[in-house]
Swiss-Prot record:
Keyword hit for tRNA processing: no
Keywords, comma-separated and alphabetical: Chemotaxis, Citrullination, Cytokine, Disulfide bond, Inflammatory response, Secreted, Signal
Name of protein: C-X-C motif chemokine 10
Family matches, as PROSITE patterns: SMALL_CYTOKINES_CXC
This protein's encoding gene: CXCL10
Species name: Macaca nemestrina
GO molecular function, one term: CXCR3 chemokine receptor binding
GO BP, sorted A to Z: adenylate cyclase-activating G protein-coupled receptor signaling pathway; chemotaxis; G protein-coupled receptor signaling pathway; immune response; inflammatory response; positive regulation of release of sequestered calcium ion into cytosol; regulation of cell population proliferation
Function description: Chemotactic for monocytes and T-lymphocytes. Binds to CXCR3.
Length: 98
């Protein structure tokens, strides 16, 4: 009887070790529902997040957090004004001393 219990426990552990997590939601969900083409003043930015495409969202998302009120705006990565903003921010970071 003891050997049977050990064998059953081993089979259960081997079976459970092969189970992998499956996401509950299979829908595509992006953080940004709507995007803005309006230019943003770099001085009014608190934080700028760039979220690359993933399995959950096929688009590049750029989220700007503003200094006043902590408002978050989704920016259009294809907009010329936003491309200029990204360039200005990256140049500012590269000039910053380590």
């Amino acid at each position: 009887m003891n050997q049977t219990a050990i064998l059953i426990c081993c089979l259960v552990f081997l079976t459970l070790s092969g189970i992998q997590g499956i996401p509950l939601s299979r829908t595509v969900r992006c953080t940004c529902i709507s995007i803005s083409n309006q230019p943003v003043n770099p001085r009014s930015l608190e934080k700028l997040e760039i979220i690359p495409p993933s399995q959950f969202c096929p688009h590049v998302e750029i989220i700007a957090t503003m200094k006043k009120k902590g408002e978050k705006r989704c920016l259009n990565p294809e907009s010329k004004a936003i491309k200029n903003l990204l360039k200005a921010v990256s140049e500012k970071k590269s000039k910053r001393p380590p």
